[in-house]
Amino acid sequence: MQAVEFCENPQGIRLRIFLQPKASRDQIVGLHDNELKIAITAPPIDGQANAHLLKYLSKLFKVPKSSIVLEKGELQRHKQIFVPEPKLIPKEIEVLG
């Protein structure tokens, strides 16, 4: 599976993410072992990193935070996330798809 997969049914984007918590700023770093590496500022304590990641992705894709689904990796750095019907696709992600 690729880092970014465009889905037809249901329509959306499935992302395989390698998460780097406690970074100096929120950013898409690039590819890391066939996953999209994303750095976020939140610590990996009590789900703070997951919540911050979903909030960051909702801003990037211009979708409600509640619509983004964390499919795999709730307690790991390796995650699989589904973003339904994104209004905007960031150029860093579009070139990978």
From Swiss-Prot:
SUPFAM superfamilies membership: YggU-like
Official protein name in the record: UPF0235 protein HAPS_1504
Family per record: Belongs to the UPF0235 family.
Pfam families assigned: DUF167
CC annotations in GO: cytoplasm
PANTHER family the UniProt entry points to: UPF0235 PROTEIN C15ORF40
InterPro entries, alphabetized: DUF167 (IPR003746), YggU-like_sf (IPR036591)
